[in-house]
Amino acid sequence: MAILGLGTDIVEIARIEAVISRSGERLARRVLSDNEWAIWETHQQPVRFLAKRFAVKEAAAKAFGTGIRNGLAFNQFEVFNDELGKPRLRLWGEALTLAEKLGVAHMHVTLADERHYACATVILES
């Protein structure tokens, strides 16, 4: 097994809150998968939820070495929690195609948040 990519991102939660205040649900619609959207709609802290998902997806795009472009979209990366609560990634569409092309066998995700920031790191492994 070899490390194929590493990405980290930090998000200022107030920045996400400001975007939501200005443009409503548009950012959430662009960033979240259908499953994440269903959670976001009823979440007790939707801004924090969105900020954490955004951080993971930015970190994943950096780990892939592409950023969000060339057919990749935020909603092709889905963040979910396993039975122990650990954050995991599920891929769709072009993100899945790219992972298969690169030979990604494992994706490791870590996520942290404090009052003002959400931070995520993603490691891609063969």
UniProtKB/Swiss-Prot annotation:
It comes from the Bacteria. One of its GO terms (molecular function) is holo-[acyl-carrier-protein] synthase activity. InterPro entries: 4-PPantetheinyl_Trfase_dom, 4-PPantetheinyl_Trfase_dom_sf, ACPS, Ppantetheine-prot_Trfase_dom. It is found in: Cytoplasm. Signal peptide: none annotated. The keyword Nuclease does not apply. Transfers the 4'-phosphopantetheine moiety from coenzyme A to a Ser of acyl-carrier-protein. Belongs to the P-Pant transferase superfamily. AcpS family. This is Holo-[acyl-carrier-protein] synthase. The gene is acpS.
